[in-house]
Every structure is written in C-alpha cells, then in structure tokens.
C-alpha cells in the first residue's frame, strides 16, 4: 500500500470475502479460494472510510456496507481491492488482506457460515495505520 496513502488507496474499493486457504500475503494469487461475497457501500458503490483520526481509518457510522452472498461456505479471509482486481499475483495492485471470524479477527461478522442469496452486512470496521520508523 505504498504511494498516496492508505485512505485514498482503499476508498472506492470493495471488500471481497472468501472461503478457503488465506494466501500468505495480499500480493499472492487467490489460488483455489472461493468468492462468497463482495461488500460495497449500499451494495453497489465503492466503500469510503472516514478521515483518519489518530492513525485509524473507520467505516462511517451511517454508511451501509453490505453484499449478497454469491456462494455458500465458511468465510476465512477478506481482501479490500479495486473492482478491476483479478485476484492474480501482483505486487502493484492495491490490496489489504485479513482474517474473518466472529470474534478477534480482522473482520468480525455475525456468522462465518455464509449462505448463497443472503446478505452479509459489515456493521463496523476499522484499520489501524501506524507510522513506519526509518
């Protein structure tokens, strides 16, 4: 996520939730992971974060981040990507990857058992941005 900053890089993206083995890094190919859900602002537009406060990007309180599940499975990881991202290995595609769970994960959902055709809302989400020391 080097470049103009994390907020402008992630704004306008989408959260893709997958089942399967989480790649070692966000630069790696998705491999055999299965896309379960794509979460967007109001289900259709790119997500946008509030301005950073004390190094934390936060989902805006009134924003509705949701998506309809396109497959059934157990959610294991997510990526925040731009809509054109193919999931192939890349060191230049802006991506953020993390774990999915119901507690103590990078993205906590009400359930990790997603069912095709049902919605998956993201009710709260934040990213800690820490300064890198020289």
Where are these regions (language model features)?
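Small cysteine-rich, disulfide-bonded extracellular modules of the LU/uPAR three-finger superfamily
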Residues: 1-78, 83-134
